[in-house]
From Swiss-Prot:
Consequence of substituting residue 12 to C: Derepression of proV and bgl expression, normal DNA-binding, normal oligomerization
Protein name: DNA-binding protein H-NS
Phenotype upon loss of function: Decreased growth below 30 degrees Celsius. Altered expression of a number of genes. Derepression of the cryptic blg operon. Alteration of chromosome organization. Double hns-stpA mutants grow slower and have reduced viable cell counts compared to single hns mutants in MC1029 and MC4100 backgrounds. In 0.3M NaCl a double hns-stpA deletion up-regulates 583 and down-regulates 86 genes, 363 of which are thought to have been horizontally acquired; 131 are also up-regulated in a double cnu-hha deletion. At 28 degrees Celsius csgD transcription is reduced.
Induction of its expression: Protein levels rise from about 4,000/cell in exponential phase to about 18,000/cell in late stationary phase (at protein level). Subject to transcriptional auto-repression. Induced by increased hydrostatic pressure. hns transcription can be repressed by overexpressed StpA (which is usually repressed by hns). Induced by cold shock (42 to 15 degrees Celsius) (at protein level).
Amino acid sequence: MSEALKILNNIRTLRAQARECTLETLEEMLEKLEVVVNERREEESAAAAEVEERTRKLQQYREMLIADGIDPNELLNSLAAVKSGTKAKRAQRPAKYSYVDENGETKTWTGQGRTPAVIKKAMDEQGKSLDDFLIKQ
């Protein structure tokens, strides 16, 4: 809370500050404060009316579903099942390169991600290119 609001919220401090103002100034401040309070009340009542209207509409739709013989929980479950099943998995990329690691095992690499250390070392030290590791089809 800012210092100005702390002053307005404390009656003793407010009285002390009010002694330094004229009555006309205090009345002008009171009018402005009343305007602000009324605006806030209107905003809050409008928000409450929106919530009430939304709740009324939801209840109306629920009653329509029940009248048509549809259980609202069944509808939600079917929507959740459709939503969770929509994410399609993409196919795994085929291997593009083949190499022999330090243990003598033949391994493959798709060409995506970090270059395997064995391939990188061969390219740097032995002057090989990626084409040397291509899988021949």
